[in-house]
Amino acid sequence: MSDDEIKAAATYFGSMKWTPWIRVVETDTVPKTRIAGGMFLALEGAEAGKEPIGQRIIEAPEKTEETELLRNPRSGFVAYVPTGSIKKGEALVTNGANKTTQCAVCHGADLEGLGPVPGLAGRSPSYVVRQLHDMQTGVRKGTWSDLMKPVVAKLTAEDMLNIAAYTASRGPGGASRSAR
């Protein structure tokens, strides 16, 4: 691609309206699920029902048939997170809660990223937890990974879940997208 073609592509994709991919829902119970195709899918029929969420994140397709069978790239997902996790995550993200650094210092005021530092707003909470855990344990390697080690050093698994719930609930410009 030429420089002009790259600029044209960047302009085109940059002009597209941001579309939420994950809807965050705080809850005490979640649909019972099975794992298929790397996804949590709600059980149907006699096996269907609810179970306590505990300290988990369950990401499932909004419309199982569209996602699993039709492979609709716009069907979206719902991320179930424990009740209260968004508020706890907000405290960790916005002021560090004496455990970590305020995320906006590097990731921007609206958590949309700054320069080479990636955005966090609206990302899959499961993905965010995995990245935080991998940086804490040293599994994640990369140019910027070492900068995150002191940031994640004191975080517990629950802290990571709460941070991920909050960041996933944020949209462009810091708008809340969570449901209760």
Q: Residue locations for each model-derived region?
A:
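Short, cysteine/histidine-rich loop/knuckle motifs that typically chelate Zn2+
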Residues: 105
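Flexible coil segments in periplasmic/lumen-exposed cytochrome c-class electron-transfer proteins
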Residues: 1-101, 138-180
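Extended intrinsically disordered, low-complexity coil regions enriched in Ser, Thr, Gly, Ala
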Residues: 121-133, 137-145
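Short Cys/His-rich local motifs and their 1-3 flanking residues in nucleic-acid-associated proteins
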Residues: 108
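Short cysteine/histidine-rich zinc-coordinating motifs and their immediately flanking basic loops
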Residues: 115-121
